[in-house]
Amino acid sequence: IQYNLIDLLENKCRLKQALIRDKRYPNLFMIPAALRCRKIMDYESKLYTLISHLKQEFDFCLIDCPAGIEDGFHFAVSAADRAVVVTSPHISAVRDAGRVICLLDGMRLSQIDLLINAYNARMVRKHDMLSQKDVEDILGLSAIGVIPADERIVVSQNKGIPVLSMHTKATRAF
C-alpha cells in the first residue's frame, strides 16, 4: 500500500493512486485508512467532498466506521446518506448499538439499518445469547440480515483470505 485516505485528503496523490482494486472482485475498490492519524478530524469537509465525488463514480461507497462513538465515528458518518449498524447479540454490544442509533437518528440519514453479526443459534436456544427478536426489540429496528458465528471467519481475517471466497455459514448469509 503506497497511499491511504489521509494522503488522498492532503492531495499527496490522485484518487486512482489511492484506490486498491481487489484481485478477486474486479469491481471492488478500497481506499485504506491511515494506521495512525491524530489529525483526522481536520479533514471532515474534504472527506465530504471526496465522498460526493465517489458517489458519482461508484454505485456504493461503504465507510467502515470504528466501533463506539468517538471522533472517528463522527468523521466517518459525516458524509453518509445511510447507515448499517452492525452489532453482535451480546448485551454490551447491543447497548452500544443503541447509543449509535440514537446519534444517527439526529443526523438526517435517509435510512438506518441493523445487521446482526456472530449469531449463535445454539447459544440462543440455551438462553445464553440474545435472540434476533430480542436485539430487534431492544433497538427498535428489524434486522436486514443475520450473520452466523463461525470460527473460520477469525482464521480468514488472520490469513488475509476474503470471507466470501470461503464456504462457511457466514458466507451463505450473503
Over which residues does each language-model region extend?
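Conserved catalytic-core segment of NTP-binding enzymes
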Residues: S45-T49, H53-A149, V155
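Short, hinge-like loop/turn segments at secondary-structure boundaries
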Residues: I1-Y3, L103-L104, L130-D134, I161-S165
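Flexible, glycine- and charge-enriched loops at secondary-structure boundaries
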Residues: L5, H90, H167
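Histidine-centered active-site loop/cap adjacent to the catalytic His
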Residues: H167-F174
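P-loop/Walker-type NTP enzyme "switch/lid" segment
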Residues: I1-Q56, V155-L164
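P-loop NTP-binding site
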Residues: S142, R152, I161, R172
